[in-house]
């Protein structure tokens, strides 16, 4: 059952001054502990091409929220700016911060078919990259400080470069594995939602979320061997056709009257 989480107002800045886009209601299909709704304030940052965003900005347990508005100004704005299916609007939240970095949190609003959605940017992987870079700089600084006149500078530089290459290789490998798993989850979710729509099952129907979850879990279990190989870095992506066949089989089983 959908529940209203909060209302978002954000400011546009331009040559003609500031314009506030108001009354953007964020709704979630997932159960939440809090029953109260809040108001978020934000600032428009820029437009982005969703196809060019790295997959890690959307975590595996990320919530996608439905957006609604009764404001004619907001409706006209989104209709004008989100004509391109791959376009997103980046909003910096004024009164919400990322729990890990204590930096501002960001939302990306986008259109999927006729629906307006948004998600919060996941900065976890970015912080890991930043941490690796900081660590490398510290190691290089220590190496330079320990060089003596009698020491071999060539050997020290070579060792430093080898450590950098090894660290970069490990980071790239982890990113590649994470991208494959995120792609699997994203494709699986879209196939399930599409299959439910084709069967005339809307999210207003009782047990909609339960049907979605058991189908998702069952599909993951079906492809557990491939996912295990992916997590070890030795597996290929699960093909779209294979995943589509799995979802169709499961939905036929679970929706059989």
UniProtKB/Swiss-Prot annotation:
GO biological-process terms attached to the record: DNA replication; regulation of DNA-templated DNA replication initiation
Keyword Chaperone: no
Keyword Chaperone (UniProt): no
Single GO cellular component term: cytoplasm
Cellular localization per UniProt: Nucleus; Cytoplasm, Cytoskeleton, Spindle pole
Keywords carried by this UniProt record: Cell cycle, Cytoplasm, Cytoskeleton, DNA replication, Nucleus
InterPro entries cross-referenced by the UniProt entry: Sld7, Sld7_C, Sld7_N
Family named by the database record: Belongs to the SLD7 family.
Chain's role: Required for the proper function of SLD3 at the initiation of DNA replication. Binds to SLD3 and reduces its affinity for CDC45, a component of the replication fork. Required for mitochondrial morphology.
Subunit structure comment from the entry: Interacts with SLD3.
Protein name: Mitochondrial morphogenesis protein SLD7
Organism: Saccharomyces cerevisiae (strain YJM789) (Baker's yeast)
């Amino acid at each position: 059952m959908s529940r209203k989480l909060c209302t978002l107002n954000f400011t546009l800045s331009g040559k003609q001054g500031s314009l506030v886009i108001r009354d953007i209601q964020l709704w979630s299909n997932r159960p939440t502990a809090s029953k109260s709704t809040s108001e978020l304030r934000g600032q428009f940052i820029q437009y982005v091409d969703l196809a060019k965003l790295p997959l890690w900005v959307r975590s595996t347990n990320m919530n996608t929220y439905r957006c609604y508005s009764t404001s004619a100004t907001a409706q006209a704005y989104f209709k004008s700016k989100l004509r391109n299916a791959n376009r997103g609007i980046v909003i910096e939240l004024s009164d919400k911060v990322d729990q890990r970095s204590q930096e501002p949190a960001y939302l990306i609003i986008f259109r999927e078919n006729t629906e307006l959605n948004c998600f919060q940017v996941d900065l976890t992987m970015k912080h890991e990259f930043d941490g690796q870079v900081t660590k490398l700089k510290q190691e290089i600084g220590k190496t330079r400080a320990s060089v003596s006149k009698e020491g071999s500078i060539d050997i020290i530089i070579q060792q430093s470069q080898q450590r950098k290459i090894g660290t970069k290789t490990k980071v790239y490998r982890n990113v590649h594995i994470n991208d494959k798993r995120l792609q699997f989850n994203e494709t699986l979710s879209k196939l399930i939602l599409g299959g439910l729509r084709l069967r005339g099952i809307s999210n207003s129907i009782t047990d909609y979320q339960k049907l979605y979850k058991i189908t998702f879990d069952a599909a993951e279990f079906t492809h557990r061997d491939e996912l295990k190989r992916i997590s070890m870095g030795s597996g290929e992506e699960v093909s779209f056709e294979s995943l589509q066949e799995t979802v169709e089989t499961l939905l036929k089983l679970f929706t059989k009257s």
